Amino acid sequence: VLLDWKLDGEDGEDKSLALLSEVVNMQPHIHFCVIYTSEKPDIVFNNILSYFSCLTKDEYEEILEDFEDEKEIIDKMVPDLISLSQNRFSKAKRSDILKSILSNKELITRVNSNPLLQKEETGEKSLGLLCGYIRLGIAFSPYIKADSMQPCPSDINAEQNTLCINNTLITVFNKDDIEANQILEVFSQQITNYEKGVMHLLGLEMRNMQRKGGTFIDSAVLSVSKEALGYHKQQSGKDFSSFV
């Protein structure tokens, strides 16, 4: 799916996010989505991370009320908390960010005890305290929140403006950087260089080979690394197709 982003003035962002929600929640899955925008990619990307975060706009309003007395402190932390959201799956990057965030012991206690910040959605991997701080940052950020619960990303690459939500691989391209006739070529290269993209392609090939039984792209398939796949190919030899 190719989404031309924010076509309807100031209200376009909300409508685009609602349309993206339809894409990622569709059954059977739509596996690839390119967002083509004249907006700054990081703004679009952060709005997506805010919108797809398992909590609703009303729940984020409750969080704002609960932490209103800490607003001045948290407002200063928001840039770090947004960076934490972008790098949540990178242990090295998030560790550096957390060093400054976790210096406030009283805030740690409050984040740990707040039911909305610790709410775990069925089927989502819990990130514990990390997830609580990500949600706290979203609550105090200016980015758009969803009216209804939306799934969290299962993988994020902020440097490439790429993420995976509900087994849909999404990437953001800026219109000033990439011509319309280059989209397919650039996206194809990006999938090839993106580990989870390779697994998406494998899943599509598996579905083509075995059309009965629905989609084969699930969290188990996406968690397999290219290195592990290569190892099993080497060990299985001619029987690799049967192994797959």
Task: Give the location of each predicted region.
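Extended charged low-complexity segments that act as oligomerization/scaffolding linkers
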Residues: 2-228, 232, 238-239
